Amino acid sequence: MKDSFSEVKLFQVKPEKTAEFESLILSIAAGQKEQQGCLDIKYVKRFFTFYDSDPHLGDPPRELTKIVKCVKYFSYWELNNKENYGKATKWFFDNYEKELAKLLIAPFDIHCGNSVY
């Protein structure tokens, strides 16, 4: 939605912790949806790559066959404005930062800004 405020997080999950992470994100996402101004929340697990295929030719991505170092997950969180985003982010850190840290190989990355489309 144009004029909303969005965030993308990258989580690099320890391979042996993926089931625990996926269980936790069900709880996190439910709470995120309840935050004031939340328009959307999605989580994606990276299963595919374009390595060895050509997307310019219409080739589909190939499925990943092994885990190297970590399993990557992305979240996309959209809120109606940056003030509600700030409050929601505080809620997220207060409730899940420590629990998530135990499952990751490094702190998660956050990229945020005004939505342009």
What are the residue ranges of the model-derived segments?
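Glycine-rich beta-strand-turn "strand-cap" elements at beta-sheet edges
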Residues: M1-D3, L39-V68, D94-Y117
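Active-site-flanking beta-strand signature of metal-NTP-handling nucleotidyl enzymes
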Residues: S4-F11, F74-Y76
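Short amphipathic alpha-helices within nucleic acid-binding modules
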Residues: A19-S23, Y73, L79-W91
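Alpha-helical elements of Rossmann-like donor-binding domains used by nucleotide-donor carbohydrate transfer enzymes
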Residues: L24-S27, E99
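A short linear boundary/processing microfeature
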Residues: S27, W91-N95
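Hydrophobic C-terminal alpha-helix "anchor/cap" residues
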Residues: A29-Q32
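Glycine-centered tight turns that cap/initiate beta-strands
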Residues: E34-G37
